[in-house]
UniProtKB/Swiss-Prot annotation:
The gene is NCR1. This is Natural cytotoxicity triggering receptor 1. Residues 22-259 are extracellular. Belongs to the natural cytotoxicity receptor (NCR) family. The chain crosses the membrane at residues 260-280. Gene3D superfamilies: Immunoglobulins.
Amino acid sequence: MPSTLAVFLVLGLGLSQRSSTQKQMLSKPAIWVRPSFMIPKGRSATIGCRGAGEAMEYQLHFEGGLSALKRPKSSPVMNWVKFPIPAMTSHTAGQYRCSYRSGELWSELSDPLELVVTGLYDTPTLSVEPRSEVTSGENVTFHCQLATATSTFFLLKKGRSSRPQLRYGNLRAEFHLGPVTPAHGGTYRCFGSYNNHAWSFPSKPVKLLVKVPGDAGDTTFAPTEHTSSDYWDSYELTTGTQSQKDHLLWNHMIQNLIRLGLAVLVLVALMGFLLEDWLHRRKSQERAHRASRRGCRRRLRAQRALET
C-alpha cells in the first residue's frame, strides 16, 4: 500500500508540473505581411511578427519547418521583428507561422499566414452576367476562364477586407452572387490557380454597379469599401513598369546580341585574312626553298662534270 501511494504521488507531481508548464507557455504572437498576401512574382514582401512582453528571440516557420531566427532591436517600443522576402517565387509562397521566446519559455505558434505568388503562366478572362449594372435584389454571375489546364479559380473584390472566393471548374468557373446589395458593388478580378499558393496573372478588372430604386429615381451607389493602394494599384503600376523594364531589357539584349554577332563576323573575317596571308607566305617560302635546292643540285652536277 505505501508503494502504491508513492506511485500516485509521483504521477500527481508529474501531472502538476506538466500543467504548470503549459500554463506558463506564452501567448501566441501576431503575424502579418506587407504589402499584401498576394505578391507578384519577383516582388519583395515583408513578414512581421509581434510578441507580448520582453521577447528575446523570434522564429519564423515555413510549411512546418524552421525558416529563420531573429532578435529584436533593444527598443521597448518596437517589440517586433521583420522577416524580409527579397523576391517572391513559387518556392517562397506557402504557409507561415511565427513564435517568440522570453527567458526560457517559448510561445505558441501564431495563426497561419498564407502567402500567394501571382503572375504565373497565363491571364484569365472575367465577365459578368446579365450585365455590369444591375438593380439591388438581382442575381449576377461572374465567369472566369483560363485556357491552360487548371480547375481552381479565385474571385477577389477590391478592398482591404476582401477575401477570395474559391470555385472549381474545367477551364472555367462560375461565381454566383445574389440577391445583390450596394455592398456587392466594386471592382472584381479573377485568378486561375495551379496550387493553393501559385496563381496566374490577374484578369482585367470588371466593375459591378448596383442601383437602388428610390422615389427620386434610381441612384447608383459607388462601392462602399475602404480601398487601399496596396496590391491592386501597385500591381498595375508594377506590372506596367516591369513590362517596360522587360521591354527595355529585351531591346538591350537584342542590341548586345547584334553587336556580338558583328564582332564575331569581323573576327572570323580577320582570321580568314590572316590564314590566307599565312598560307600565301608558306607557299612562297616552299617555292623559294625548292628553287634553292634545285640550284644547289645544278651547281653540284656542274662541279662534278668539270672534275671529270
